[in-house]
């Protein structure tokens, strides 16, 4: 019997280290279960949690630096670590040229925090026995909980017969359904790994059920990025199984593991197809088909537009970009013609291109290089002399890495702590296995790093400001609940004497890029402190110079101060930065006061292509106020508006004013009111006289003709009523069916039943309620 030469005290110490290291890794992986805790966005407390765990882990590693010195030394012998460090330095340098340097700090707290967590995780993993199985079990446990949090509401929706596809109820523990879907896909390879390790049938069946239910949830969530990642994982897994099959001499038993993924996939898709029969739920194949519909799918078309302008920006700014985290501001310049309200494209929906727009081509190449090195490491591991059971694990890491890369190419996982945590874990494991492979190939010998404690010291020094920034950001996102909530509701109920303390100074823009200072300035404006508000609004312009929000508020203050030139200057500035309806309306009102029809026509010609009804209405109001009655161009615009927005009756009123003039329209309305009053008194002849007079003044208003005909009909003068109904039916038809119905009754009274029945049928076509009864009574 072999003797254990490890001293008891050393063995106990190692066990303690294993337990602590495992506990820290588990703590890291629990990041996805941190709730929003009152913040606008769940990511704020999650980033704070990540840095807090890193502080504790770094302190533990520092305290035991001698124990971990070889792990630290190994890490800094890799090209990956130095490339990662270079990327961090380059990103940090963007503070000095960024549009908004404060936003760089906010994002550095996340990017650098992730890199420090990577260092901690790598070091902690080195000494843990059975690390692959431990990580797989924890990740699978997280997968089980996340899947259940999606499955439970999903089954409830299906039971109710409701439309479950893309339902926001399926977001699970995350902020939205897309994050939930990719979080499930990236963790699923760990469950598949355990399924391959399982020795007992019931264990394999349990993992199979978990994977099946996970894929079922994914199908109903219907996130296209998750579909791509899922299918890519399936392809990689099958390829890996076939590689083992041919490498081992084609033993049939090695084909069985293919079923571990294929069967759950087929079963899950099949069940989802059956569950959607007779409902409006999108099927897997229907949703998959939209992935390539770039011209008909707005979401895909929008992404392609983002990618093109992103590449354009990189080519125009090859060395330095907008600054880390600043694409959300720069995007306004490129996408302003497509922005509605203040909803800007915060993310590129492609982390790789977005990094290029923010950090230039050097930053893009460094970030892309990280993935290139990881792929190269995977290939090296596969060709190494490592034991097959160790190389076996890297195949599943490759699946998770591919999921992250798909997510990074179609979404923005760099902003999601739940995805960053799995990514850094996969990175750490791949680098660790690469070093093990080099050691087996005798290309690397682990050696302790002298003064290894300095690595932890540097991490802790960096974590102090980083944690402070994430804390400030978390507090800000709590306060933004107040600012954004009251802004969206148009309220000012929060006390002015507390408004400056509602959010800290970091960040200086909201999650929607509205400048915090400008949002606070609204309260000072409401309380008449205009000079204080102007000071804050100028700070708001510095924070976000492209949104136009601050400039619009400044224009309103200068209008109140009767400083017309300044008001117009800032109104135009806001409109040119972001030509949205509120900016258009504010600028237009000032142009009306100045009588500047040429500028009014210019901005309308620019904005009319958006087909926003408020833009058309505001322009027509301005045109009617400044241009002569019957102006040919004004009438042409009115006709175009009615054709574009046939259901909006406001445009008919505006057209009448353009054609007839407001005074005539108002006079006709007043006379019609007199006629309606006489009709109510059953003085039908005098009512008809007044109503016909109104119709003569305003021949564009169908109701005047219709009511005149109704008055003559009620007076028993059926023949006299017919021309008025004909005017409505043939020229002004509102498609209500009322004129057709009353004219039909008039014709019945005149003995023309056949023609009357045709009119009743027309009225029924327009869903006029009394038409059915008339048809039954007179047309059978």
Question: How does the language model describe each region?
Answer:
Residues 526, 560, 593-594, 628, ...:
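Register position in tetratricopeptide repeats
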Residues 152-156, 220, 226, 241-297, ...:
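A membrane-periplasm/extracellular boundary helix in multi-pass inner-membrane enzymes
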Residues 2-37, 51-61, 85-95, 106-120, ...:
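Alpha-helical transmembrane segments of multi-pass inner-membrane proteins
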Residues 176, 292, 297, 302-345, ...:
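TM-adjacent membrane-interface loops and short helices in multi-pass inner/ER membrane proteins
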Residues 477, 515, 549, 582-583, ...:
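Start-of-helix register in tetratricopeptide repeats
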Residues 1-92, 99-106, 116-140, 193-208, ...:
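Transmembrane signal-anchor hairpin modules in multi-pass inner-membrane enzymes, especially those
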């Amino acid at each position: 019997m072999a003797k254990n030469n490890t001293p008891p005290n050393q063995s106990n110490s190692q066990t303690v280290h294993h337990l602590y290291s495992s506990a820290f890794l588990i703590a890291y992986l629990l990041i996805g279960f941190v709730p929003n805790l009152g913040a606008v966005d769940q990511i704020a407390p999650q980033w704070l949690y990540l840095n807090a765990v890193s502080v504790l882990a770094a302190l533990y590693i520092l305290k035991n630096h001698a124990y971990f010195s070889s792990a630290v030394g190994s890490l800094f012998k890799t090209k990956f670590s130095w490339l990662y460090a270079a990327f961090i330095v380059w990103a940090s340098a963007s503070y000095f040229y960024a549009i908004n340097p404060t936003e760089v700090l906010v994002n550095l707290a996340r990017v650098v925090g992730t890199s420090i967590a990577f260092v901690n995780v790598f070091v902690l993993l080195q000494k843990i026995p059975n690390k692959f199985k431990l990580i797989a079990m924890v990740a699978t446990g997280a997968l089980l909980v996340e899947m259940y949090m999606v499955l439970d509401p999903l089954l409830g929706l299906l039971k109710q017969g409701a439309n479950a596809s893309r339902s926001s109820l399926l977001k699970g523990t995350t902020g939205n359904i897309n994050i939930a879907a990719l979080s499930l896909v990236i963790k699923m390879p760990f469950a598949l790994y355990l399924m391959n390790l399982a020795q007992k049938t019931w264990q394999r069946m349990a993992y199979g059920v978990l994977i099946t239910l996970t894929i079922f949830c994914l199908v109903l969530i219907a996130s296209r990025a998750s579909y791509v990642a899922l299918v890519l994982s399936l392809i990689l897994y099958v390829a890996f199984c076939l590689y083992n099959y041919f490498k081992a001499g084609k033993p049939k038993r090695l084909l069985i593991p293919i079923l571990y993924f294929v069967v759950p996939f087929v079963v899950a898709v099949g069940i989802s197809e059956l569950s959607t029969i007779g409902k409006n739920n999108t099927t897997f194949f229907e949703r998959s088909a939209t992935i390539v519909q770039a011209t008909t799918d707005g979401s895909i078309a929008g992404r392609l537009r983002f990618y093109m302008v992103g590449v354009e920006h990189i080519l125009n700014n090859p060395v330095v970009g907008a600054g880390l985290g600043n694409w959300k501001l720069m995007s306004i310049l490129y996408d302003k013609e497509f922005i509605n309200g203040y909803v800007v494209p915060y993310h590129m929906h492609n982390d790789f291109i977005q990094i290029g727009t923010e950090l230039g081509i050097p930053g893009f190449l460094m970030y892309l290089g990280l993935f290139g090195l990881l792929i190269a490491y995977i290939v090296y591991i596969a060709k190494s002399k490592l034991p097959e059971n160790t190389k076996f694990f890297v195949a599943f890491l490759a699946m998770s890495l591919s999921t992250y890369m798909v997510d990074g190419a179609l979404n923005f996982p760099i902003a999601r702590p739940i995805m960053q945590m799995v990514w850094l874990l996969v990175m750490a494991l791949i680098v660790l296995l690469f070093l093990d492979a080099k050691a087996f190939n005798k290309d690397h010998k682990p050696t302790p790093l002298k003064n290894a404690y300095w690595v932890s010291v540097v991490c802790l020094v960096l974590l102090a400001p980083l944690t402070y920034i994430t804390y400030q950001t978390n507090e800000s996102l709590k306060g933004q609940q107040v600012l954004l909530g009251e802004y969206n509701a148009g309220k000012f109920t929060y006390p002015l004497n507390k408004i400056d303390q509602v959010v800290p100074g970091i960040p200086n823009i909201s999650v929607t890029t509205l400048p915090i200072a400008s949002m606070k300035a609204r309260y000072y404006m409401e309380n008449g402190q205009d000079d204080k508000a102007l000071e804050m609004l100028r700070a708001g312009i510095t924070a976000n110079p492209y949104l136009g929000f601050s400039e619009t508020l400044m224009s309103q203050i200068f209008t109140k101060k009767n400083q017309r030139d300044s008001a117009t200057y800032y109104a135009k500035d806001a409109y040119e930065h972001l030509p949205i309806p509120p900016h258009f309306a504010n600028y237009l009102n000032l142009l009306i006061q100045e009588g500047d029809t040429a500028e009014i026509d210019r901005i309308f010609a620019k904005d009319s292509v958006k087909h926003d009804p408020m833009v058309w209405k505001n322009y027509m109001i301005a045109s009617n106020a400044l241009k002569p009655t019957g102006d040919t161009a004004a009438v042409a615009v009115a006709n175009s508006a009615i054709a574009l927005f046939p259901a909006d009756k406001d445009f008919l009123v505006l057209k009448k004013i353009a054609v007839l003039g407001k005074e005539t329209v108002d006079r006709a309305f007043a006379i019609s009111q007199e006629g309606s009053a006489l009709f109510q008194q059953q003085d039908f002849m005098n009512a008809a006289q007044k109503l016909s007079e109104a119709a003569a003044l305003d021949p564009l208003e169908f109701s005047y003709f219709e009511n005149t005909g109704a008055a003559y009909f009620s007076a028993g003068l059926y023949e006299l009523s017919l021309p008025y109904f004909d005017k409505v039916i043939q020229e002004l038809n509102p498609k209500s069916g009322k004129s057709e119905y009353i004219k039909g009754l008039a014709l019945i009274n005149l003995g023309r039943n056949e023609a009357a029945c045709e009119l009743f049928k027309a009225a029924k076509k327009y869903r006029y309620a009394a038409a059915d009864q008339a048809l039954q009574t007179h047309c059978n």
